[in-house]
């Protein structure tokens, strides 16, 4: 999912790109039955990969996939599993003096019940956060933006020039 959209819908692997795919559990019919899914394994792969690569892009599918089931308690467990996995990722990035962006392209698990009590199993259009984790987080300003701003933000943090084709702008600027 992340790979396909990050690559502009292209399935073919680009030169210099490695893909590490962690399969979701197949032993359950629906993910409310295993809301932790593969979050711990994704975090372990991230911790290994961040030592080797300048950029690692990953996806925790828990909130989305479990959110589609409409089972609130499972949704909470899914988010807790991601929280635990992210703790490991954040610790590793900070140990290395790196920077981490955490975001999503849509909501789901944050709104699993409609006003009438029926399950909401669809993606939401709620705003999503962009969380910046780094040792210098107190020396930068993080602006509000849109999804088109995420890639320019990543390029900016890497010190790379933004292509003219990108219409967004960096959401992280030096200074408070």
Model-identified regions with their sequence ranges:
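Feature captures the catalytic ectodomains and active-site-proximal regions of enzymes
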Residues: 2-176
